């Protein structure tokens, strides 16, 4: 199975929600920390780029699924009796948002500039992906024996190098900014003695180190048992488990729960998702140690790999679920 790049980390970014409501005032009047002031200042811009980043990841996912079906070679891989997925999430709305950013008179930082740099190739890809979506949805390939499929495949391939180049640059800058924001949030929760939320963040950070190591080692369902370094993952797993135990202990303090705007039981879904993620990490490490390869279905199709326990894709999918639950808890906390 050929993939775009080494591996696609299709994960949600930790959403940034305002740590306070209302207008930021001087610390002497409102008790707003330096971290809170910086977070509030960056809130709108960061949330906008979260949406851009997630859109790019969705496009990446669509490209991955398409090329798994059609192949990465110049000649389109004609697979009889099998439907091809060509749902590549480039649309006019996303392009308009990038144009709006480009035409804005606000001062542009590096992240803005990297986002704007994606515009030309996305505009070039839009009519191609629109036509592909219609072509495959209406099964027009049955009428022309895949003649148009080859033409569309060639056009899409011609844009791919540029797309990968500009989106990689954007993702790198965004991820750096995201790490800075997360560090500020962690520091802020620690300063304000929001120990439950702080411990939850720390567990997620340790889990994220495992995700980053998967990316660093370049693992996917086709090769993780041959290439994976189990020792490194074991060390990271130990740190994650310690952070999780600390978090679990903190939510038993009902007084602290109330202080942070939570009720007993609010974290039950998060705990369930976190345990599933931890289990998938554990199985992932065991499979590397035992050289237990992924099934043929998972090797040939990343959709199936996400559901086979212990594959890199399955670990990533379960981490996504942890992040989703974390975001729900933050949203609930912010509303109170």
What would you call each of these model-derived segments?
Residues 1-4:
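Positively charged n-region of N-terminal signal peptides that target proteins for export
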Residues 7-18:
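Hydrophobic membrane-insertion alpha-helices, especially the h-region
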Residues 234-336:
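A cross-kingdom marker for long, charged
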Residues 24-81, 150, 184-208, 212-215, ...:
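Immediate post-signal-peptide N-terminus of mature secreted/exported proteins
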Residues 69-71, 95-109, 138-151, 183, ...:
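Short, charged/polar, low-complexity loop and linker segments
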Residues 153-277:
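Extended amphipathic alpha-helical interaction segments
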